[in-house]
Amino acid sequence: MEDNIMAGSTFGTIFRITTWGESHGKALGVVIDGCPAGLALDESDIQKYLNRRKPGTSSITTPRKEADEVEILSGTFEGRTTGTPISLIVRNTSQISKDYSEIASYYRPGHADYTFDAKYGFRDYRGGGRSSGRETIGRVAAGAIACKILEQLGVTICAYTRSLGPVEADMEHFDKEAILNTPTAMPDYVASEKAVAFLETVKKDTDSVGGCMECIISGMPAGIGDPVFEKLDANLAKAIMSIGAVKAVEIGDGCMVSRRFGSENNDAFCIEDGNIAKETNHSGGILGGISDGDSIIVRAHVKPTPSIFRTQQTVNNTPEEININIKGRHDPVIVPRAVVVMECMAALTVLDAMMVNMSARLDAMVDFYKKS
């Protein structure tokens, strides 16, 4: 194998996706292998998810305008999946590559310019190429299909913005409708208004901020995930850490558990409506890498947008130290548009785990094949 082959664009074991395309290329997309036949599917099922991540929808996102309209190229017939690979494409329509012409000669602080050059000896400098946030279009398109399958299995996934800079959502007044109806994707209208006002000042100050996203996976049956190297929480963490700007992931109570006694942190088991349940959920719905039947709680911490309109020090490829002023169209905060990406990566992970789990028990296999 040649050293400069770009691996790492494929995710999943059975429900397997490969994303492709660059920020300023002709198009981006995804190929999905392993989707079961018979799922009712059209572009509108996918488009509603892509609309949540597309740019240019508010004053706190990049002014780049893209329709991000998806087209299904293969894998469906008469409105249903055929079980063969599904290919989805979204064409770029608003590239302004001249904004990035100077970037070919230097490395932007906080971006992957230097590391891509170090690895491949060559890079697409226009908007970051494969390291751009637009790469997530393929993930969201595939995740939309995963979410539709999961709904039929009784599993729902809801991600939202927990905080933006110092502004936090009040979880005691959680309002699911607010997630889709605010520019911040916060479940709290009041906090969202405060966050927008804060972000406007950040934008005027030519700076950027980070934030925290949270995801709740409801309806997961107990017993999903594998021990040791294929733990469900480990795979969720990997999936969400693969989102470009995410720098930390927590499951359940996360970092807080390091300050507790075992007597405080253990979730007591109980019987609820005749079923095994827990009185608390500090574990975040996963024990030993396997789902315990409770809601799975995941948080992701996102760094500030690295492209800021201030003079910054860096080096060029001579190399020598220089000062730069970045041009282009950039978000003062990434989090609101990344929320749906987190939701879709969680969906891809748990659906794949549930499909893998079909082979875990002989009685389940016997029951299935005897019925069929």
Language-model features: locations:
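Glycine-rich, mobile lid/loop segments that gate access to catalytic sites or pores
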Residues: 118-228
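A short glycine/serine-rich beta->alpha loop
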Residues: 16-19, 124-135, 222-226, 283-286, ...
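Glycine-rich, N-terminal phosphate-binding loop and its surrounding beta-alpha-beta segment
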Residues: 50-109, 113
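Alpha-helical support elements that line or immediately flank enzyme active sites
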Residues: 26-38, 134-155, 230, 234-238, ...
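Glycine-rich anion/phosphate-binding loop at the beta-strand->alpha-helix junction
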Residues: 20, 26, 206-321
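N-terminal, positively charged regions that mediate nucleic acid binding
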Residues: 5-64
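Internal helix-turn-beta structural module
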Residues: 16, 307-372
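Short acidic, glycine/tyrosine-flanked loop/strand segments centered on an H-E-D-like triad
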Residues: 104-129, 312-330
